Amino acid sequence: MQNQKIRIRLKAFDYRLIDQSALEIVDTAKRTGAVVRGPVPLPTRIERFDLLRSPHVNKASRDQFEIRTHQRLMDIIDPTDKTVDALMKLDLPAGVDVEIKLQ
């Protein structure tokens, strides 16, 4: 797998989970002899929602909610077969979305 790059993008609502997962991926890749760039924190996506408190009147009275999606980006340069096997066996927390691209 020479001259290839694995790009890993992590998404989660909890920044502690995403940082822990990123650390596990970096440790696993470095143990197998690959070069890792990152984790690079990407901008946090914030979705805001306004809901009326009352079902009938009082339009001025609203509840405000938000969802924050944290993101990290990592590149693994020149991965070996051992690196790919170790990454596939890695067990990450349930709240982390992992997107992997081979380039």
Swiss-Prot record:
<dbReference type="InterPro" id="IPR001848">
    <property type="entry name" value="Ribosomal_uS10"/>
</dbReference>
<protein>
    <recommendedName>
        <fullName>Small ribosomal subunit protein uS10</fullName>
    </recommendedName>
</protein>
<dbReference type="InterPro" id="IPR036838">
    <property type="entry name" value="Ribosomal_uS10_dom_sf"/>
</dbReference>
<keyword id="KW-0689">Ribosomal protein</keyword>
<dbReference type="InterPro" id="IPR027486">
    <property type="entry name" value="Ribosomal_uS10_dom"/>
</dbReference>
<dbReference type="InterPro" id="IPR018268">
    <property type="entry name" value="Ribosomal_uS10_CS"/>
</dbReference>
<dbReference type="GO" id="GO:0000049">
    <property type="term" value="F:tRNA binding"/>
</dbReference>
<dbReference type="GO" id="GO:1990904">
    <property type="term" value="C:ribonucleoprotein complex"/>
</dbReference>
<comment type="similarity">
    <text>Belongs to the universal ribosomal protein uS10 family.</text>
</comment>
<dbReference type="GO" id="GO:0006412">
    <property type="term" value="P:translation"/>
</dbReference>
<dbReference type="Pfam" id="PF00338">
    <property type="entry name" value="Ribosomal_S10"/>
</dbReference>
<comment type="subunit">
    <text>Part of the 30S ribosomal subunit.</text>
</comment>
<dbReference type="GO" id="GO:0005840">
    <property type="term" value="C:ribosome"/>
</dbReference>
<comment type="function">
    <text>Involved in the binding of tRNA to the ribosomes.</text>
</comment>
<dbReference type="GO" id="GO:0003735">
    <property type="term" value="F:structural constituent of ribosome"/>
</dbReference>
<keyword id="KW-0687">Ribonucleoprotein</keyword>
